[in-house]
């Protein structure tokens, strides 16, 4: 009887844990969707609201790690790009979320267009990896790594 009770308790714990993880995945997917809806809308404050102070990134052009200590400065810099006429229309494709407690790794392809102030539009397809952490009841991005997607050779 004790074994049966123990198995029932373990089953309930595992079920609750799996349910919580599924909720976390859905919450993170929703956060990432909002992150890019605000980017497309030119809403710098809304976009940066999904970052933590100290956010770091490797951009698609390569280069050194960029660390942003001030969310206010990051918001102002992005808003300046929007005000200059830059427009971004990205979608996340093949989104995958792996949750590790209060941290998660989000991978996807980032596809879409960038329009520069002179009206020239460039199609982009990048690989994107984000590290997000739980901040109270929200998930926030602490790091992103974006690199150009290169088609696999068929040779």
Label each region the model flagged:
Residues 1-5:
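Positively charged n-region of N-terminal signal peptides that target proteins for export
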Residues 7-16:
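Bacterial N-terminal signal peptides
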Residues 17-50, 153-155:
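Short, low-complexity N-terminal intrinsically disordered segments enriched in polar/charged residues
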Residues 25-26, 30, 44-99, 109, ...:
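A solvent-exposed, acidic/Ser-Thr-rich amphipathic alpha-helical stretch
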Residues 102-112:
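A short hydrophobic beta-strand element
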Residues 105, 125-150:
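Short beta-strand edge/turn micro-motifs at domain boundaries
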Residues 112-116, 132:
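Beta-strand elements of well-folded, non-transmembrane domains
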Residues 117-123, 151-155:
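A short acidic/glycine-rich loop-to-helix N-cap element
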């Amino acid at each position: 009887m004790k074994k049966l009770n123990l198995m029932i308790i373990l089953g309930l714990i595992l079920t609750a844990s799996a349910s919580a993880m599924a909720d976390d995945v859905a919450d993170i997917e929703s956060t990432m969707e909002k992150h890019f809806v605000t980017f497309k809308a030119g809403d710098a404050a809304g976009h940066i609201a999904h970052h933590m102070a100290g956010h770091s990134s490797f951009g698609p052009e390569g280069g050194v790690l960029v660390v942003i200590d001030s969310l206010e400065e990051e918001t102002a810099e992005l808003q300046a790009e929007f005000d200059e006429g830059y427009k971004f229309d990205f979608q996340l494709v093949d989104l995958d979320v792996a949750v590790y407690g209060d941290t998660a790794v989000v991978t996807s392809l980032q596809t879409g267009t960038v329009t520069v102030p002179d009206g020239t539009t460039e199609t982009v397809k990048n690989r994107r990896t984000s590290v997000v952490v739980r901040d109270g009841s929200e998930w926030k991005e602490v790091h992103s790594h974006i690199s150009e997607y290169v088609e696999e050779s068929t040779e």
